[in-house]
Design a protein with these regions (language model features):
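A generic transmembrane alpha-helix motif of multi-pass inner-membrane proteins
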Residues: 197, 227, 234, 413-414, ...
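Membrane-interface loop-to-helix entry segments
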Residues: 137, 150-212, 261, 284-288, ...
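TM-loop-TM module centered on a large, flexible mid-protein loop between adjacent transmembrane helices
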Residues: 102-104, 109, 142, 214-242, ...
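C-terminal membrane-solvent junction of multi-pass transporters and transport-like membrane proteins
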Residues: 160, 174-177, 378-389, 423-472, ...
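Helix-loop-helix connectors at the membrane interface of multi-pass transporters/channels
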Residues: 4-5, 10-18, 101-111, 133-153, ...
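Hydrophobic transmembrane alpha-helices that form the core helical bundles
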Residues: 58-61, 71, 81-165, 170, ...
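Membrane-interface "cap" regions at the ends of multi-pass membrane proteins
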Residues: 1-57, 61-66, 81, 85, ...
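Hydrophobic alpha-helical segments and their helix-loop junctions in multi-pass secondary transporters
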Residues: 181-234, 301-306, 428-440
Length: 511
């Protein structure tokens, strides 16, 4: 019998009014192959990455006191947990690719749904992927001299993209292995921090000289010249700090939110999770609780070893700058020079794990937007194994472009503001979903409703206001990005019709 080459339109549903469908054109060949452990690993693998090994060193000199630093991490965790409880309810109701995008599109309309999806795509994934790849390249360059950091980042992105484009199951297995490795490294650092005795911390001579010469009013500049190590350590730990709940603290929390990015990633692959009504909420909420606890423990180790005011180093221009490798510095003091190099190598593996998860989930966001008509139809193509090949190729190409055209510091400054705005849109949508469809089945119901979304929205607004008060440039850049997204929408979107779908099965097999 000759093969039937007719379009396989029965594989799709285009039912904008169907609450079970969420109004999206979803290909049924997406397979539910991700188990609860892998779903939890996706979130944990996304969250434990570059943030915990960099952010504390960036905010330490700004906040000065250990209490302020711990409060910043706690409040960022509260925001993440409130968002996780809310999103868990939504993702259990709408278990398909990119549940955040689907619910915002459904509740707030296609325009804000598009903005939410583009923020998640461009900022939460593409920009963060490029940043993590660049950091990984820098760490590799510390271990292997005379290598090009950006070339390393490019090779890493291409390799992980190839794995996840080839197979869905292989990608989750790779992530599972890397999550175990990274968790072991973090636990090892935490255990060493509470069991190894260290000497009082004394900044290097170059740091103290730079402080006295270029920043005479700083805490480091007032360190007594002939003081003992214990006296210097005590001087740094008792320095004056900003008041609690100040704009300075709020702006620092914006930076800390970068370390919590990834708690929502199980919702982005909900269409491929087995028993999503049970497993997706476990993954989302469980990852925030587990990773948040680890973050607090690791920060206690950092603060035990290095006073916040001393978390600085001399930059290429001879001026003091926030410490960029707090994890490596602490590991070297706890484990010695050899241990420091081993931890540097382990951090490269951790960053690879973060990138692995981001590549997996970002492709689903692109595909979901294509099925909605918010991106060209070709971006929604799946291969025979159900992986969004075209979307993965597009995200890898975009991230590599970012790696080669911008610097790391300028890339990260405004990420927190835009991601906070995207979370606020999701929280508003979840509240509207409760109001408009109170009788819809909810496999998971968030506790203490409406407190979780209100906490997330309220604290999110405070963070944006604090960031603007401290430095208006990141907020202005975020506003410009939003304007550009809205302006570009007519060029990227298309009317979604049955005829637009075509022979998706044949197209995906050719990809």
């Amino acid at each position: 019998m000759a093969p039937d080459h007719r379009p396989t339109r029965s594989r799709f549903r285009v039912q904008p009014g169907d609450p079970d469908n969420g109004g999206d054109a979803r290909p049924e060949q997406q397979r539910r192959v991700i188990g609860p452990g892998s779903a939890l690993g996706i979130c944990i693998g996304s969250m434990i990455g570059s943030g915990i090994f960099a952010v504390t060193g960036q905010i330490g000199p700004q906040l000065v006191s250990p209490l302020n630093i711990m409060l910043a991490w706690i409040l960022a965790g509260v925001i993440a947990l409130a968002g996780a409880l809310t999103l868990a309810e939504v993702a259990a109701m709408r278990p398909r690719a990119s549940a955040q995008y689907v619910v915002v599109h459904e509740m707030l309309g296609p325009r804000l749904g598009y903005v939410n999806g583009m923020i998640t795509l461009l900022i939460g994934y593409l920009a963060s992927m490029a940043a993590v790849a660049m950091i990984a390249g820098a760490y590799v360059a510390r271990l292997v001299p005379d290598v090009d950091e950006r070339m390393i980042a490019t090779v890493l992105l291409l390799g992980l993209g190839g794995v996840h484009a080839a197979t869905v199951v292989g990608g989750t297995r790779l992530n599972d292995v890397l999550v175990v490795l990274k968790s072991a490294v973090v636990v090892l650092l935490a255990v060493a921090g509470f069991t190894v005795t260290t000497e009082p911390f004394v900044p290097s001579t170059s740091v103290l000289e730079a402080a006295r010469l270029l920043e005479p009013g700083s805490v480091l500049a007032t360190v007594p010249v002939d003081a003992t190590a214990a006296a210097i350590d005590a001087h740094l730990r008792t320095a004056a700090s900003p008041p609690l709940l100040s704009a300075t603290l709020g702006a620092a929390i914006v930076a800390v939110t970068f370390a919590y990015l990834g708690w929502s990633n199980a919702a982005d692959v909900a269409g491929e999770v087995r028993r999503p009504g049970r497993n997706v909420p476990i993954a989302i909420v469980g990852s925030v609780l587990l990773v948040g606890s680890l973050y607090l423990i690791v920060n206690l180790v950092y603060l035990r070893v290095v006073p916040p005011a001393a978390m600085v180093e001399v930059g290429p221009d001879g001026r003091l700058q926030p410490m960029t490798s707090i994890g490596a510095v602490v590991a070297e003091r706890l484990l010695g020079p050899v241990g420091g190099r081993l931890v540097t190598g382990a951090i490269v593996l951790l960053l690879a794990s973060t990138l692995s998860v981001a590549v997996m989930t970002c492709g689903r966001v692109i595909a979901a937007m294509a099925w909605k008509g918010e991106l060209p139809a070709a971006a929604g193509g799946l291969n025979r194994r159900g992986a969004p090949t075209v979307a993965i190729a597009a995200q890898i190409a975009a991230s590599i472009g970012i790696v080669w055209i911008t610097g790391l510091r300028s890339l990260l400054e405004y990420v927190g503001v835009l991601v906070t705005l995207a979370v606020v849109l999701t929280m508003l949508s979840a509240m509207l979903l409760r109001h408009r469809r109170p009788d819809d089945p909810r496999p998971f119901r968030m506790p203490l409703y409406p407190l979780p979304p209100l906490v997330s929205i309220g604290l999110g607004g405070w963070l944006v206001a604090s960031a603007a008060a401290e430095d208006w440039i990141p907020v202005a850049a975020a506003a410009g990005t939003l304007a550009a997204m809205v302006a570009a929408r007519p060029l990227l979107t298309r009317p979604l019709e049955i005829d637009d779908i075509g022979d998706h099965d044949g197209a995906s097999r050719a990809s």
